[in-house]
Amino acid sequence: MNNSTNSSNNVALTSPYKTFEVVFIVLVAGSLSLVTIIGNILVMVSIKVNRHLQTVNNYFLFSLACADLIIGVFSMNLYTLYTVIGYWPLGPVVCDLWLALDYVVSNASVMNLLIISFDRYFCVTKPLTYPVKRTTKMAGMMIAAAWVLSFILWAPAILFWQFIVGVRTVEDGECYIQFFSNAAVTFGTAIAAFYLPVIIMTVLYWHISRASKSRIKKDKKEPVANQDPVSPSLVQGRIVKPNNNNMPGSDDGLEHNKIQNGKTPRDAVTENCVQGEEKESSNDSTSVSAVASNMRDDEITQDENTVSTSVGHSKDENSKQTCIKIVTKTPKGDQCTPTNTTVELVGSSGQNGDEKQNIVARKIVKMTKQPAKKKPPPSREKKVTRTILAILLAFIITWAPYNVMVLINTFCAPCIPNTVWTIGYWLCYINSTINPACYALCNATFKKTFKHLLMCHYKNIGATR
């Protein structure tokens, strides 16, 4: 009991803050730590459970959230303890481990921001070649490299500097990096760890913004009529004429014809066909389907991803139908253009069947000749660019005060009060609190997924857009 009392008296004597100030600091710092932990766990869980968030860019954000989570759990709370007590009570080993963890994680955050900036830069400047290389495996390798490099740069120097120079110069009750007592080293590390990355990221974002604006202006200047239509020579038709008996398992006559300007050559190749409804769905294709029967009217429905044409209605259940299907395959990437179009026609042997096939075929070929409507720039690309801008601004605003003080301290150590140092250091930590808010504000999918998780609405959360 006496030891405990003496320890409490020592804390009271050495603490620079009064009791109510200590309570206030602990409440504020504890709240920030809790918000940081919850926010970054939400980011990580959202990416894990929502398949629409499982993109290469968001994997980089997942790595950044891991770093921010570590800061919220360890760095914030240990620094709060150090601040309110007024001295370091946990000994030199824990001090060095905390500093190593703190600086490795902080540097990993900067490295992740650099990776995100370079990734977006290459996506914009090399849209044809870079997306091919931009795989999940490559993203994992880049993330691993960022963490390993950060560890190599900071951990050995912090943990073993005292053994390299042969003496520990950090006094008991204090906790700081020993080689930071050298003004030149402090200046150099500030340049390498903050100023150089900020310059690189700013230049990259300027190029990203410039390229995006240039593309938007170019798209606005191009009239819709000048866009390349889908070439009718790429449209291939397949007409299927089932036998009159049309029993399950029976062989149907199959004719393959090319449709050019609404006409089909007489030469045909006969194959077997299994009757039934066919459906195709792919991230890299757009489907257009048409169904024709006893035609009474024409219906055309279009949306962003599919075009569906229904011609006529069936008078009875036994009447046969004519099906036309167009599958437009497009390459992977942020911007896709049609590369091949296939038309399949399934016809009936009923009366006027050939007439109906020709009418529907002409409609489809006419539709494929029409130029596609001009689409605005992809919203996903805008989301990514806005998110990058938000996290870069948050990083610069929160880290700049401390790193400016580091440079000032190099030339004038007494110029900066201890309280200002503490606030500047805490601002660096607050960046980890702000990042999840940046994701939610700039990306509606993140925001909706956060809301579902917080309100325990787990139904269909994996498909939230």
From Swiss-Prot:
The chain crosses the membrane at residues 22-44, 59-79, 97-118, 139-161, 184-208, 387-409, 418-441. CDD domains: 7tmA_mAChR_M2 (cd15297). Residues 1-21, 80-96, 162-183, 410-417 are extracellular. It is found in: Cell membrane; Postsynaptic cell membrane. A motif (Important for signaling) lies at residues 119-121, 435-439. Phosphorylated in response to agonist treatment. GO terms for biological process: adenylate cyclase-inhibiting G protein-coupled acetylcholine receptor signaling pathway; chemical synaptic transmission; G protein-coupled acetylcholine receptor signaling pathway; G protein-coupled receptor signaling pathway, coupled to cyclic nucleotide second messenger; regulation of heart contraction; regulation of smooth muscle contraction. Disulfide bonds join C95-C175, C412-C415. InterPro entries: GPCR_Rhodpsn, GPCR_Rhodpsn_7TM, Musac_Ach_M2_rcpt, Musac_Ach_rcpt. Residues 45-58, 119-138, 209-386, 442-465 are cytoplasmic. Keywords: Cell membrane, Disulfide bond, G-protein coupled receptor, Glycoprotein, Membrane, Phosphoprotein, Postsynaptic cell membrane, Receptor, Synapse, Transducer, Transmembrane, Transmembrane helix. The modification Phosphoserine is found at S231. Residues 217-319 are annotated as: Disordered. Residues 283-292, 303-312 have a biased composition (Polar residues). The modification Phosphothreonine is found at T445, T449, T464. Its main location: membrane. Pfam families: 7tm_1. The muscarinic acetylcholine receptor mediates various cellular responses, including inhibition of adenylate cyclase, breakdown of phosphoinositides and modulation of potassium channels through the action of G proteins. Primary transducing effect is adenylate cyclase inhibition. Signaling promotes phospholipase C activity, leading to the release of inositol trisphosphate (IP3); this then triggers calcium ion release into the cytosol. PANTHER family: 5-HYDROXYTRYPTAMINE RECEPTOR (PTHR24247), MUSCARINIC ACETYLCHOLINE RECEPTOR M2 (PTHR24247:SF207). Belongs to the G-protein coupled receptor 1 family. Muscarinic acetylcholine receptor subfamily. CHRM2 sub-subfamily. This is Muscarinic acetylcholine receptor M2. The gene is CHRM2.
